[in-house]
Amino acid sequence: MFKVINVSDHFIILSDFYQTGGFMELPTIIVNFKLYEQGTGDAALEMAILHEKIAAEMGVSIAIVVNFLDLEAIARRVKIPVFAQGMDPVGYGSHTGSISADMLFEKGAYGVLLNHAERPLEYVMLGECVSRARDAGLFTVVCVDSPEQGEVVKKYNPDMIAVEPPGLIGGDLSVAEADPAMIEKAVSELGRGNVIVGAGIRNGSDVRTSLALGASGVLLASGVVRADDPEMVLRDLAEALKRY
């Protein structure tokens, strides 16, 4: 469904079914809006437009992860990759309250974030979600807590693995500062071009360190969405990304 090509030392991920902008380039910044007040409803749309603006002005790859209720409105409005925050391993049928991959695709999602520490999945369910998402034409980013867990989920062939030590998520110390060796290990074991890192990422220095260690991008949330000045933070992150 997806293929990766190298253009001027950048990786570009192409999809025949890409919904909102044509491609996602690596390295990238992926910002999860979670269920923060600043990242829901009208505020979510404004935040998404800001991300699109910075991506265009600075010529970098930025994607966003939004809640189900905001997804369609945002995907229709912006031309950057829009991810869903999760899904269920089901198709159409008697599945009250469930969200299917086909529904996400129809609402304009580019991809789906799976197995986040705040929304973990059993391995069997995770494998089924990745398979169904792939069949629907969605790009999959699977979160893991370590390179070792990444080795386990790699067999499901997700498009990208996001390594996030749970103890650092939402904290003041980033994975780039606390455990750079873990980033190197993840890239070595899971493959260059397959790994992004997260947990505590909040500034350009974290981005530069992560990319220098071989990561293909960063995943963050509160560092942008809850910042006093999200635009200033995004510009700092994007400036670091431009060097790669």
Question: Which residue stretches match the model-derived regions?
Answer:
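Conserved N-terminal beta1-alpha1 strand-loop-helix module at the mouth
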Residues: 13-99, 140, 148-157, 226
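Conserved, mostly hydrophobic/aromatic
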Residues: 34, 67, 104, 164, ...
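Active-site-adjacent beta->alpha loops and helix N-cap segments on the catalytic face
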Residues: 40-46, 68-76, 92-101, 117-132, ...
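Glycine-rich beta-to-alpha transition loops that act as phosphate-gripper elements at the mouths
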Residues: 85-89, 93-95, 122-124, 142-147, ...
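Non-catalytic positions within long, well-ordered alpha-helices that form the structural scaffold/packing
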Residues: 97, 105-106, 134, 154, ...
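Glycine-rich phosphate-binding active-site loops on the catalytic face of alpha/beta enzymes
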Residues: 111-121, 161-173, 213-233
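Catalytic cores of alpha/beta
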Residues: 145-157, 201-218
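Short loop-to-alpha-helix "cap/lid" segments that border enzyme active sites
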Residues: 154-163, 174-193
